[in-house]
């Protein structure tokens, strides 16, 4: 069996325990389903207990309902999930406001979920890996919004740029311990959150016109990229922000 066959089959992540935040919907759920299908033991975090129940029925995962905007709760949930070999920091929120009307509460909550929670959960998981003397891999789910200024997305764009920067620092500091850290940066991905943000046909068509492949991403396509970065095939990939954008950033 060659590496490609193994990666596509049910054993690529056999024996690996992976923590996925924001696993209730969208990219996080698609990632949890894909990794479970490839043999991983999945631990799913989401603030929606209902979403976790349906996911648990689907893939038999361990679940923790938690609001990652709460720093203490985020740390406690991450600690309860240990030990893990792989981490996907996917949880994210978007509060759409014009810059001049962007309020402090929305800005702080966005940074808390999109950046601070990734730091906290990453600290817990990496500390456990180091204590156990094992390597691992972490993928932070960012966005092309880290590099592009989108109207109404001040807090969101700022949070994703911060997440990319955090990814690079994590890669530098954790690399010597055999822990790789990378980011994926999707274009608009057809998740419940994105479908709300891009429901205006005029806004959507303008965005599509900037994507050479002329379509938005599917959650499963982002999940497959995450799986690549987590897997042995990417064992020399560390500290990158990998666009999954149909060529948007190439223009």
What is each PLM-predicted segment?
Residues 143:
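Residue(s) in the substrate-gating loop at a strand-loop-helix junction
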Residues 119, 180, 215-244, 249-250:
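C-terminal substrate-recognition "lid" of short-chain dehydrogenase/reductases
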Residues 100, 148-154, 176, 214, ...:
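Active-site loop immediately N-terminal to the catalytic Tyr-X3-Lys motif
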Residues 122, 159, 167:
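Active-site helix of classical SDR
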Residues 98-99, 103-108, 207:
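Substrate-binding pocket helix/loop in short-chain dehydrogenase/reductase
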Residues 127, 172-176, 235:
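Alpha-helical segment proximal to the catalytic Tyr-Lys
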């Amino acid at each position: 069996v060659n590496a490609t066959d193994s990666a596509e089959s049910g054993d690529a992540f056999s024996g690996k325990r992976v923590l996925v935040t924001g696993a209730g919907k969208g990219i996080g759920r698609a990632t949890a389903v894909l990794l479970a299908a490839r043999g991983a033991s999945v631990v799913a975090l989401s603030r929606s207990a209902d979403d976790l129940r349906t996911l648990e029925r689907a893939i038999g995962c361990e679940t923790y309902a938690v609001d990652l905007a709460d720093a203490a709760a985020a740390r406690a949930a991450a600690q309860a999930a240990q030990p893990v070999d792989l981490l996907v920091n996917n949880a994210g929120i978007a509060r759409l406001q014009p810059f001049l009307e962007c309020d402090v509460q929305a800005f702080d909550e966005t940074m808390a979920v999109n950046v601070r929670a990734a730091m906290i959960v990453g600290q817990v998981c990496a500390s456990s890996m180091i204590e156990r003397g094992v390597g691992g891999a972490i993928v932070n789910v960012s966005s092309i919004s880290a590099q592009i200024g989108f109207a109404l997305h001040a807090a969101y764009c700022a949070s994703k740029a911060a997440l990319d920067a955090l990814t690079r620092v994590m890669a530098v500091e954790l690399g010597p311990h055999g822990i790789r850290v990378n980011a994926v940066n999707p274009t608009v991905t057809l998740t419940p959150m994105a479908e709300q943000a891009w429901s205006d046909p005029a806004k959507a068509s303008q965005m599509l016109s900037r994507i050479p492949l002329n379509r938005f991403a599917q959650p499963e396509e982002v999940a497959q990229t995450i799986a690549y970065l987590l897997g042995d095939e990417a064992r020399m990939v560390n500290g990158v922000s990998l666009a999954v954008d149909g060529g948007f950033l190439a223009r």
